Amino acid sequence: MTGDLSKTIYLTMDTDWAGDDVLSDSLTLIDELQVPVTIFITHETKLLETIRDHPLIRLGIHPNFYPLLQNHADQDYLSVIGEIKKIVPEAVSARSHGLIDSTAILEAFKAQGITRDLNLFIPFSSGIELKPFRHFCGLLRIPYFYEDDAYCSENSGKTACEHILSSGDGLKVFNFHPIHLFLNTENMNRYLDAKPFQREYSQLIKHVNRNQQIGARAFLKQVVECGRENYFAFDHVENL
């Protein structure tokens, strides 16, 4: 484990089947901010090689086990993990879609070469100081305290700087989604209204929140600004 947890910020992103226009927007934002990000991949995309070759990006897997829970699956959990690992064979980090978790899933992650999992979301509002810890199967579990959609639903009003400066010596891991960065989502109604148009860029862009002070995109920029102003480092979760 490297770095000082009290002075390091970790940024992550779940692609969640975002269209290429939306993914491209996130890549442009990463270039603008010049910060390291781990992106958890859900699907094949023509942008995958561009993402893979980006010097600021590392790739993780984001398997979807929901069809298993809904009895709509034509494969088991091992196959789900195996298929997404074929797309991102180099991945050593994993976060399940919807944070679906079990000992069996963690053990399967490890068997596929995963060393770190990020399935534990404990919001900043809990007041709990987060630390990475070793699961008995051998994985390093890395809890995180911010997720853009959960932040919209919780409506706590806590600022980016409060997350960073009031979390003491604890982990500071943030998670975003390309669609919410694109829309600058400030409430889930905006996302739900835009959701039918995720593959129709000309319609989707009409749903963007243009307020530069409030929303997921604004929050990410504020995280980076506050971190730099207060001399925090930025690093990949793979370096924990």
Task: Identify the meaning behind each predicted range.
Residues 1, 18-22, 68-84:
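Short, composition-biased local secondary-structure segments
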Residues 95-96, 175:
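Acidic beta-strand-to-loop metal/phosphate-binding motif
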Residues 53-80, 93, 99:
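Substrate-binding cleft of extracellular glycoside hydrolase catalytic domains
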Residues 40, 96-97:
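Structural motif
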